[in-house]
C-alpha cells in the first residue's frame, strides 16, 4: 500500500518539461564594472586610478613603517605555512601518482616556491597579481634552461610562474559581458617589445576580490589610504615645525621701496633674491648668510636686516597623538592592530590573542584564494597538457596558520586529568601535543 502511495505521489509531482528560451543559456547583462576599452577606473578617488594608484600603493608599502610591518608579517606567516598536494581519490593509485607529480612540479621550478608565493602576495598591495605560466619538458639535468629539470620523465611541468608587474598593465581585454580574456602589457624598460598580449589561458590571475569581476581586485590598503594620506602630510608639517623651532623663523627687513608696485627691475630682483635666502635658511654644517649692509639716511638704522624669531611654549596640538591615531586606523583596516599593542602602554594578553586570531582568520582567506586559483586553473591545465583526465587532478592544500596558546592548552589538559579523563598513555594524543609545541615525536613503547 505504501509503495502505491509513493508511486502516485511521484506521478502527481511530475510537471511538464518546459522548453528553454533562446536567452536561458546566454549572458544578457554585464557586471557593470566602470571600464572603458579595458582601462578600469572603478575607484572614485583620482589618486587611486590607473598608474597613479600603483605609485601610491607602492609608496605606502615601501615608505610607511606601519604598512611595511603589516605586509612583512603577512609574508612571513605565509612563508611558514606547510603546503601539500592531496590526491583526488586516496584509494586510486593513479590519483596518488598525479598528486606526487604535481608536488614535484612545485619543487622543480627555476624559482623557489617561497619566492613564487612572495610575488603572488603582491596582489594584497595592488589588488591583483598576474602571472604568466611558462612550461617545460622535464628532460633531466640538461644545458637548456627550457628543459632542465630534477626529473627525466619527459612530462610537461612548470618552469616558472613569473609575475607581470602591475604598473606595466596597459589595459585589459574584456568581453561584452565583463569576462576577462587577457591583458595587454607595456614594459617601459623594454619598449622594443611593444604591446604584448597575455591571454588569460596562459596566465594565473590572483585577486583579493572578484566583485563585479574587476580584474584589478581591490587593494587591502584601500581603506588605509585616507589615514595614510593625512598622516604623511602631518609628518611633513611636523618636520617643518621642528626645523623652524630649532632654527627659528627667518624674517627679513627691506626698504619699503622694494615692496612697492613701482619698484624698479633691479629692486624686484633684489627682493626676489632676499626671499630665496629666507626660504633656504637651514641649520647645517654649511650655514651662513651674505647680506648687504646699508643704512637708511633718515633713521640711521639698517636698511636691510635678517632675524630668526624663535617660538616658545608647546603647540596647541600634540602631533604624536595624531600620528598614533592614524597608525591605529591603518592597522585596523587589515585587522593587524595587534602590532601596536604595548606601544601605547595599553592592551592585555587576552586582547592580543583574540586580535591575532582574527588576523589569522583573514589571512586564511587569502591562502584559500591562492590554493583555489591553482586548483581551478593551473593544475587542470597541466593535467590536460600531459593527457591526464581532469578527474585525477589533485588539490593544493595548506595547513592554516594558528596562534597556539600552549599555556591555555596545558590548563585545559590539567583540568581534564583532574576530572578523571583517561588521557595518557595515548601515543597519538602525545604526538599531537608535541607537534603543537614544535617538539620531536615520541617513540611508542614496544609491548
Model-predicted regions and their roles:
Residues 1-28, 269-308, 388-447:
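C-terminal anchoring/interaction modules
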Residues 2-68, 72, 76, 88, ...:
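Structured, contiguous alpha/beta core segments that scaffold functional sites
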Residues 76-81, 244-255, 300-311, 338-339, ...:
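Short acidic (Asp/Glu) and glycine-rich catalytic loops that position anionic groups and cofactors
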Residues 90, 136-138, 294, 311, ...:
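An acidic- and aromatic-residue-enriched active-site/binding cleft used to recognize and process polar
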Residues 91, 95, 307:
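Cation-handling catalytic/transport regions enriched in His/Asp/Glu
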Residues 252-253, 291-293, 333, 342-343:
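Short His-Asn-centered micro-motif
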Residues 264-268, 313-321:
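Ordered, soluble secondary-structure elements with a strong preference for glycine-centered loop motifs
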Residues 317-447:
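C-terminal helix-loop subdomains that flank or include functional centers
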